[in-house]
């Protein structure tokens, strides 16, 4: 857990360093619980958040109150007359459609505004991997190059990010596995009929979860082979 906290701090510090000084108004897409938004506000930025999750929106409101405007919607469904100096996707770009979202960014950005994308992508989407998630990086590059955006920086942090995946795998192996076995033992002994029905109904999902999270395949090496993690800054032209 200590390593995870250190990794999160390193991530946040690098993210903040990528934001140009002249970018004052920021739209934070997929704001989580509002930690990044708080750091941005603390350094003097004007921040608006997009959070389709009611639970997370409430967490942001508790943390930031009237200091931030929250849009409880998906980015592609956002309706606003406001424009921004920078639109931030911190591990949220993988959840939005590429072309539609980039075109929307262009409309929402002020003249010479920026997009900052911090996320992982698939190197080769045709190659099957249990490590799902992330858009095709070749497709993303093709789309953004077809639009009026100039690449300012493109930092590959895949190698630095991979150890976090290994920490997760170690945690699941050392703690998740035994906890899963203990839960199974409890259910089978206390509620045998319910346990059998549960395993039958969700047998495919359980098999998939075991294959992904408890097979030892969720490794740093696998991540580096299949994914590329980028901090990318683009400017509207």
Place the predicted regions along the sequence by residue.
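A short SAM/SAH-binding and catalytic strip from SAM-dependent methyltransferases
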Residues: 86-98
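A short acidic, Gly/Pro-enriched loop at the edge of an enzyme's catalytic core
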Residues: 77-87
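Class I SAM-dependent methyltransferase SAM/SAH-binding core
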Residues: 27-77
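Substrate-binding/catalytic lobe of Class I Rossmann-like enzymes that use SAM or dcSAM, i.e.
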Residues: 128-218
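Conserved alpha-helix/loop element of class I SAM-dependent methyltransferases that forms part
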Residues: 5-22
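A short glycine-rich, Lys/Arg-flanked "PGG" loop and its adjoining helix->strand segment in the class I
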Residues: 99-114
């Amino acid at each position: 857990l200590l390593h995870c906290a250190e990794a999160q701090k390193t991530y946040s510090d690098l993210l903040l360093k990528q934001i140009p000084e002249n970018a004052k108004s920021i739209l934070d897409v997929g704001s989580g619980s509002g930690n990044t938004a708080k750091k941005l506000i603390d350094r003097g930025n004007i921040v608006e958040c997009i959070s389709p999750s009611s639970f997370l929106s409430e967490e942001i409101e508790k943390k930031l109150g009237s200091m931030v405007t929250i849009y409880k919607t998906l980015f592609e469904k956002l309706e606003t007359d406001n424009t921004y100096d920078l639109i931030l996707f911190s591990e949220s770009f993988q959840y939005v459609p590429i072309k539609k979202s980039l075109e929307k960014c262009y409309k929402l950005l002020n003249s010479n505004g920026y997009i900052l994308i911090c996320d992982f992508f698939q190197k080769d989407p045709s190659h099957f991997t249990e490590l799902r998630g992330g858009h095709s990086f070749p497709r993303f590059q093709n789309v953004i190059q077809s639009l009026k955006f100039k690449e300012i920086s493109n930092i590959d942090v895949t190698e630095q990010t991979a150890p976090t995946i290994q920490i997760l795998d170690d945690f699941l192996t050392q703690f998740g596995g035994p906890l899963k076995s203990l839960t199974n033992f409890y259910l089978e002994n206390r509620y045998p009929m319910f346990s059998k029905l549960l395993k039958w109904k969700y047998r495919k999902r359980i098999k998939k979860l075991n294959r992904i999270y408890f097979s030892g395949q969720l490794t740093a090496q696998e991540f580096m082979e299949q994914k590329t993690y980028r901090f990318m800054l683009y400017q509207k032209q």
